[in-house]
């Protein structure tokens, strides 16, 4: 099974990369979790933010192949418990399609990305810093896998 986190923003602090890698390396070989970084467009004082978001969205969608599943991470999405995420992960595995988890930039996702989404997932009603979201997603995917495999990590 292949999961891909497509996130706007690059050049994260070292602790973010280390946190992400910690959970990626714990996953079994049959569950691949890849990070794809989309460069954040420069936001100047007079920037056309809508245009920048649209460009970032186009870059995100360019990484998605036809037939692949798109899941957006949005505050307005549906919150999943660990057990619900485990059920989704199992469903995705049986579906046998690559799953793309989409995380937008500071202003969120482009409407085109949201329109392509098959599912909308909310990590929290809180506004979370994007570097932390990467680690949180990695940990939650690992935790969901441990639920499915009977591993004692999730008790």
Curated annotation (Swiss-Prot):
<feature type="binding site">
    <location>
        <begin position="123"/>
        <end position="128"/>
    </location>
    <ligand>
        <name>S-adenosyl-L-methionine</name>
    </ligand>
</feature>
<dbReference type="InterPro" id="IPR029028">
    <property type="entry name" value="Alpha/beta_knot_MTases"/>
</dbReference>
<protein>
    <recommendedName>
        <fullName>Ribosomal RNA large subunit methyltransferase H</fullName>
        <ecNumber>2.1.1.177</ecNumber>
    </recommendedName>
</protein>
<dbReference type="GO" id="GO:0005737">
    <property type="term" value="C:cytoplasm"/>
</dbReference>
<comment type="subunit">
    <text>Homodimer.</text>
</comment>
<keyword id="KW-0489">Methyltransferase</keyword>
<dbReference type="InterPro" id="IPR003742">
    <property type="entry name" value="RlmH-like"/>
</dbReference>
<dbReference type="InterPro" id="IPR029026">
    <property type="entry name" value="tRNA_m1G_MTases_N"/>
</dbReference>
<keyword id="KW-0949">S-adenosyl-L-methionine</keyword>
<feature type="binding site">
    <location>
        <position position="104"/>
    </location>
    <ligand>
        <name>S-adenosyl-L-methionine</name>
    </ligand>
</feature>
<comment type="function">
    <text>Specifically methylates the pseudouridine at position 1915 (m3Psi1915) in 23S rRNA.</text>
</comment>
<keyword id="KW-0808">Transferase</keyword>
<comment type="similarity">
    <text>Belongs to the RNA methyltransferase RlmH family.</text>
</comment>
<dbReference type="Pfam" id="PF02590">
    <property type="entry name" value="SPOUT_MTase"/>
</dbReference>
<keyword id="KW-0698">rRNA processing</keyword>
<feature type="binding site">
    <location>
        <position position="73"/>
    </location>
    <ligand>
        <name>S-adenosyl-L-methionine</name>
    </ligand>
</feature>
<dbReference type="GO" id="GO:0070038">
    <property type="term" value="F:rRNA (pseudouridine-N3-)-methyltransferase activity"/>
</dbReference>
<keyword id="KW-0963">Cytoplasm</keyword>
């Amino acid at each position: 099974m292949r999961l891909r986190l497509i996130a706007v923003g690059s050049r994260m602090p070292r602790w973010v990369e280390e946190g992400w890698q910690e959970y990626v390396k714990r996953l079994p070989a049959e569950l691949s979790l890849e990070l794809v970084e989309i460069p954040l467009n420069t936001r100047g004082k007079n920037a056309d933010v809508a245009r920048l978001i649209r460009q970032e969205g186009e870059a995100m969608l360019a990484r998605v192949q036809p037939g692949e599943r798109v899941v957006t991470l949005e505050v307005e999405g549906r919150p999943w418990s660990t057990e619900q995420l485990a059920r989704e992960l199992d469903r995705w595995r049986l579906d046998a399609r690559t799953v793309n988890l989409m995380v937008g930039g500071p202003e969120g996702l482009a409407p085109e990305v949201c329109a392509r989404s098959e599912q909308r997932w909310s990590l929290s009603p809180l506004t979370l810093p994007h570097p932390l979201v990467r680690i949180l997603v990695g940990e939650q995917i690992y935790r969901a896998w441990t639920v499915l495999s009977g591993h004692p990590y999730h008790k």
